[in-house]
Amino acid sequence: MAANAPIEKIRNIGISAHIDSGKTTLSERILFYTGRIHEIHEVRGKDGVGAIMDNMDLEREKGITIQSAATFAMWGEYNINLIDTPGHVDFTIEVERSLRVLDGAILVLCSVAGVQSQSITVDRQMKRYRVPRIAFVNKMDRSGANYDRVAAQLKEKLNHHPVQMQMPIGAEDRLKGLINLIEMKAYYFDGESGEDIREEEIPAELLEEAKTRRQQMIEGVAEVDDQLGELFLADQPISNEALIAAVRRATIGLKMTPVMCGSAYKNKGVQLLLNAVCAFLPNPKEATNEALDQKNNEAKVILDSDPEKPFVGLAFKLEDGRYGQLTYMRIYQGRVTKGDFIINQSNQKKVKVPRIVRMHSSQMNDINEATAGDIVALFGIECASGDTFTDGVVNYTMTSMHVPDAVISLAVAPKDRSNLTNFSKALNRFTKEDPTFRVHRDEESGQTIIRGMGELHLEIYIERMKREYNCEVQAGKPQVAYRETISQKGEFAYTHKKQTGGSGQFARVCGYIEPLPSDAVQQYEFVDDIVGGSIPREFIPACDKGFTEAVKKGSLIGFPVVGVRVVINDGAFHAVDSSEMAFKTAAIMGFREGYAAAKPIILEPMMKVEVQAPEDFQGSVVGQLNQRRGTILSTETAEGYVTAVAEVPLNTMFGYSTDLRSATQGKGEYTMEFSRYTPVPRNESEALMAAYKEKLAAEQAARK
């Protein structure tokens, strides 16, 4: 284990991909070649061990990566912090969190399936955080592998400027090695696990094609790099050093994506990919990181990866380890030493750093100090995910991470009442770890409701309660997060009057509600059009409070009302009897009056569903989606597989994975992510309203 490398030699990289693109296998090979592990394990724990990066039992069993493990590795003189991120859409917050702390990333694509829906989602997240990336076309040994087609899809589907840096020698099961188009050398991977690299001249029969491809590569880089472009246009000779420097500049500037290829499973191309990570991806000094200065009205500040500047670190992930809470932290500026006192900017609490470790999945190595650019884990620090720590000299917070809304909820309770303490502990820990996992108690029913990003997301947490807290859980039927809105303008003029001896209550509010434009960012807007003081200024905020309260629960089925603008333009008050309370009540009742007149409708979440199955099953795949009120957006067939993309109501998607498995003999796969809200068909709407009325009547009867 080397000491801290100079910052120029540090790379903080993530591996992001569509589920089953071979991402965890690639991470495992990287750890093997960098000497962090001494044998290779396969992903699904068939050999009783499972991949090192998948360190929760559940992950090894399901063969999907859930928590992004942070691992430290060394390649030559470079220190590489590797973050393995989940590829399943239900775990998007983990991907977002790790991208927040990375300087660069490897986008893994399957050579057969190419750019899939989850690749698009992950890429969108990378764009949001301006993460430079290298594309790695994996599984080149598979039947139907097509390096050129995947590179073309990067341009068509993701709007990248892809430049192929390599050329495969052979394809599918005849994949022998790779040609590096910069060095113009052929590389072969010998030894039991591809650890012995043999460099040779390019085979004569491939030389012409390699020369053509090298020229295309130079043209591709010259298009986006001015310095290389000038040499190219002037017909000057271009050295390998000039070419590497140009690729690096263009990649870090997000102007191009170098495209590499290989097969992690067959141990081909991983070492060349590591060389490319060091050559083309930025060091922490070259990445731009912003913070908000709390002393200066949240003005943006650019952080400097200088170990001598005041300390700023971001807690981006929490885990409960054997020795207490483990806090993963990215150091953006300054340094932190064992025994230091640091300040949590979210609550101004001062905490001591008892222990700093470098993580290797769930194993750890103690270190005394971490400096700018490092990713480490601290013990004994109480905080929430996303908290910023400083040494107190500066009052900076890192920009808050984008947290998507939950789309599905579930009522849960422990099967055994004596397990209530563990049940509460588990929920408390999970909400701290994962901002997209939300818990609330339904006041009316007294039930505990958990909300998340999809069925699998919630299932995993229920399973974790059982495993980690010995708490079996009863779960209700999943509930869809419906919304209500209005379809036209509705007026209101409501007077709230109460006289019960002593001072009474009086308030009158008049105005209208109308739909907001469909592209509006906020879901509720309050407009004060009062002139002439018909409602005194001090009562206007109370009106806003009342309307805000009213939109929390619509009258059709009791779900939040979205997409409304409330305008008040008249009213009346009483010198003695008017109060904030009276105006708040009048606003609530006024909203209900206007809402009833504005033709309210129910909205349901629509999901973008992408299904992949052998093309023999195309009819049944499309048929199933149609049965579930789905709208087919596209179908593509390639290499014997059909990919169908559809928009389907979430309400009809429960149990879909079982149906798809049986319809495709277990060969079909699907991913699903939230797309938008749309009006519910009339018959569905009537059924939902009838069920809501019944529920209210039952609750009323129970209270009597």
Curated annotation (Swiss-Prot):
Recorded name of the encoding gene: fusA1
UniProt keyword annotation of tRNA-binding present: no
Protein name as annotated: Elongation factor G 1
PROSITE patterns: G_TR_1, G_TR_2
SMART domains attached to this UniProt entry: EFG_C, EFG_IV
Organism whose genome encodes this protein: Myxococcus xanthus (strain DK1622)
Pfam families: EFG_C, EFG_III, EFG_IV, GTP_EFTU, GTP_EFTU_D2
Biological function: Catalyzes the GTP-dependent ribosomal translocation step during translation elongation. During this step, the ribosome changes from the pre-translocational (PRE) to the post-translocational (POST) state as the newly formed A-site-bound peptidyl-tRNA and P-site-bound deacylated tRNA move to the P and E sites, respectively. Catalyzes the coordinated movement of the two tRNA molecules, the mRNA and conformational changes in the ribosome.
Principal location class: cytoplasm
Residue ranges occupied by any tr-type G domain in the UniProt entry: 8-285
